[in-house]
């Protein structure tokens, strides 16, 4: 990935997060943009979002994001000057849930493992 693409990823992610936080406070509660990947030609961007809540609530928030994709893109375009502003595709990011599950399994293993006897110091 080029340095320019990385900078565009970070810039759009930051601006989009800011727009959701300030302009759409009630609608965007529990939504976090975890990653943004812009295509090399800068025409398309995949926006990975983490949504806190039940599967039903996640689906509802994801539908809201997809329904307002054009409006959100317009708002980002007002803040960022690029030759091409990518179209946003919103994708649910399951990595926070997977991470939480891994931590839970590690905690269970920790509890089941007997403590090691401490070495005697002479």
UniProtKB/Swiss-Prot annotation:
Keywords from the UniProt entry: Cytoplasm, Ribosome biogenesis
The organism's place on the tree of life at top rank: Bacteria
Segments traversing the membrane: none
One Pfam family from the record: RBFA
Location of the protein in the cell: Cytoplasm
InterPro entries, per the entry: KH_dom-like_a/b (IPR015946), RbfA (IPR000238), RbfA_dom_sf (IPR023799)
Chief place of localization: cytoplasm
SUPFAM superfamilies cross-referenced by the UniProt entry: Ribosome-binding factor A, RbfA
Gene Ontology CC: cytosol
GO biological process, one term: maturation of SSU-rRNA
Subunit structure: Monomer. Binds 30S ribosomal subunits, but not 50S ribosomal subunits or 70S ribosomes.
Function: One of several proteins that assist in the late maturation steps of the functional core of the 30S ribosomal subunit. Associates with free 30S ribosomal subunits (but not with 30S subunits that are part of 70S ribosomes or polysomes). Required for efficient processing of 16S rRNA. May interact with the 5'-terminal helix region of 16S rRNA.
Family: Belongs to the RbfA family.
Name the UniProt record assigns to this protein: Ribosome-binding factor A
Organism listed in the record: Opitutus terrae (strain DSM 11246 / JCM 15787 / PB90-1)
